[in-house]
Amino acid sequence: MLTAMLFRPWAGQIIARIGPIKVLRIILLINAMALVLYGFTGLEGYLIARIMQGVCTAFFSMSLQLGIIDALPEKYRSEGVSLYSLFSTIPNLLGPLIAVGIWHVENMSIFAIVMIFIAVTTTLFGYRTTFANTQKEVSPKDEVLPFNAMTVYVQFFKNKALFCSGMIMILSSIVFGAMSTFIPLYTVREGFANAGIFLTIQAITVVIARFYLRKYVPSDGLWHHLFMMIVLTLLMVASVIVAFGPHIVSIFVYISAIFIGITQALVYPTLTTYLSFVLPKIGRNMLLGLFIACADLGISLGGVLMGPISDTVGFKWMYILCALLVTIAMTLSKIRQRQSVSKAS
């Protein structure tokens, strides 16, 4: 994840120069090599494979998302991003089940065969798709950018739309990361609910919400403050419910998992679609890469930052702090609304 986060802005720059189709073809081959490494190497090979997959993740996701943004009409852009997010979530549900099955078989040959199968099928399917659409590809002109892959990080603070959206994404992702990381420990220590059921409900909700609610994600380039407030309120309420989970009926804890799933399904597509409209066209790909890196950063901080906090003040107060972080995100949404109104006037 760290590798992907660092490479995303650079990936956006490369894609802007040579186009998403060519990048996708190269990344499919590198990903196949990384998957094969898993089946035939030890720990050293795993480290190399993980770094390779981090690079692949950065370029692969950027290629697909930028391709979707460029290819779809504006009114369908949010639906395209939502469906991309949906299909990127499904492997996270099926992957652990496959891994557990291979683990119980206790045969590394099966693991190697599965990795090779995934590598071959993804490469063949990806190449078939890109070849079928080659005639639609337009070679992008080289952009003269006012920043590069290193100085682009300064733009996070200079661009008001990017800053507000990025901070909302970071704060929300911190809560998502804290939920998925510490819910198992919290429920076992305090003896309430069931972490497996909670996380399953959350994951299923993400999938269902991204499919059935995709048409409600704004796709007009305007900042919809009321929509963001409703979505973020669900996350804030869920954080408070989880914080007081040991003292309430478990059914409310499971309902909070639904709230978290809905928020997780809607926040990312909403902000990504909005930025695809308002960011300057010159350097847009790099700036979008920087925003997507914010989601990676937030998930990481949810475990790295909130872990020591929970050790110091306990899980209850850590999740109350999560609710306060969401409140800050709601404040940023209000600030962005005022900025949009003043700019329009």
Which residues does each PLM region occupy?
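Transmembrane alpha-helices of Major Facilitator/SLC transporters
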Residues: 2-6, 197-218
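C-terminal membrane-cytosol helix-exit motif in multi-pass small-molecule transporters
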Residues: 116-139, 332-336
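Helix-to-loop junctions at the C-terminal end of transmembrane segments
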Residues: 7-19, 210-223, 311
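Conserved MFS/SLC helix-loop-helix module at the cytosolic interface between two early adjacent transmembrane helices
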Residues: 6-38
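Cytoplasmic helix-loop-helix junction between adjacent transmembrane helices
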Residues: 51-87
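Cytoplasmic membrane-interface "Motif A"-like loop-to-helix N-cap segments
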Residues: 17-27, 219-232
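Juxtamembrane intracellular "pre-TM" segments in multi-pass secondary transporters
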Residues: 133-165
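Paired small-residue
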Residues: 44-53, 251-259
